[in-house]
């Protein structure tokens, strides 16, 4: 059912530009199939744009041209959304669950996304052609638990761009041991979307070297 889906916010045009029609198609697909396929819960439909699509898209300016890995891509949040917003960046979506991989492949084909590869694997088991320039993740684990999964995927000098909640700084403070072990430098919380989104997005950005 899509009758309870949130109307498209005005900020969508600002964040997606001429890629907005592709974002609309993906959002419509997620609204019509996401609950049935176990990708999103029914309570997410009234906030699908603001809480999920735009919440992911606001991160796009932090990405650099290169190869970005998205760990635990699930429904495609943020990986597919970022791939729509940033066609100049190559993405590797890492997802272990077969039904989600099927969904991701379907969306990549339908949306015509030429900048996306999908790897069916747990992050710690992923076999990649080369180290990544950046790694994203959303709603996966606490920062200290994410570091062993994400930091080893990066090249020297690569960057973590991890979407987090209001406790982002506390997560950094609680990860001192892992930060040292995985040679993480300059971990900081960046707040995105003020004055643009109804709810801001918080990102932990850090360099691994």
Curated annotation (Swiss-Prot):
GO terms for cellular component: cytosol
Keyword Transmembrane helix annotated: no
Protein name according to UniProt: Ribosomal RNA small subunit methyltransferase G
GO molecular function, one term: rRNA (guanine-N7-)-methyltransferase activity
Keywords assigned: Cytoplasm, Methyltransferase, rRNA processing, S-adenosyl-L-methionine, Transferase
EC identifiers of the protein: 2.1.1.-
Function as written in the Swiss-Prot or TrEMBL entry: Specifically methylates the N7 position of guanine in position 518 of 16S rRNA.
Subcellular location: Cytoplasm
Source species, domain of life: Bacteria
Principal place of residence: cytoplasm
SUPFAM superfamilies named among the record's database cross-references: S-adenosyl-L-methionine-dependent methyltransferases (SSF53335)
Similarity comment text for this entry: Belongs to the methyltransferase superfamily. RNA methyltransferase RsmG family.
Record: residues binding S-adenosyl-L-methionine: 72, 77, 123-124, 138
Annotated signal sequence range: none
Lineage: Bacteria, Bacillati, Actinomycetota, Actinomycetes, Micrococcales
